[in-house]
Amino acid sequence: MISTVALFWALCVVCVVNMARYYSSLRALLVVLRGCDPLLYQYVDGGGFFTSHGQPSKQIRLVGYIFAQRYLDHHDPEFIRRCERLRGQFILTSALCGLVVVSLVALMLWY
C-alpha cells in the first residue's frame, strides 16, 4: 500500500514543478509584452519585475490584469495565447497549493 507521507511529498513535488513552470511562463510573457505593448510593460514594471526592488503593487496589477481576462481585447494573438496559458497555470498552481495545505492539515490530524 502507498504511504500517505510519500503521497504528500509527491504532491509537494508536483506543486513545486508547476510553480517553476508558472515562473518561467511569466518571464516569457514579459519578454513578449516588452515587444508588443511597451506601455503595459512599463505599467507593470516589466524591467524590475523579478528584482529585489520590484514593486509588489505593480506585480499584483499584472496578476489582476490576467485573472480578470482584460488581455482578450489586445491586438497581439501571441500575447493573448501566453496570457491564457499563464492564467491556466495560475489557477492550477493555486489549486495545488491549496491541496498541499489541506493535505498537510490532514496529515497532522492523522498522525
UniProtKB/Swiss-Prot annotation:
Species of origin: Yersinia pestis
Keyword terms, alphabetized: Cell inner membrane, Cell membrane, Membrane, Transmembrane, Transmembrane helix
Pfam families registered for this protein in UniProt: UspB (PF10625)
Subcellular compartments: Cell inner membrane
Coiled coil: none
Transmembrane segments: 1-21, 90-110
Protein name in the entry: Universal stress protein B
Principal place of residence: membrane
Membrane topology: Multi-pass membrane protein
Family according to the record: Belongs to the universal stress protein B family.
Gene Ontology cellular component list: plasma membrane
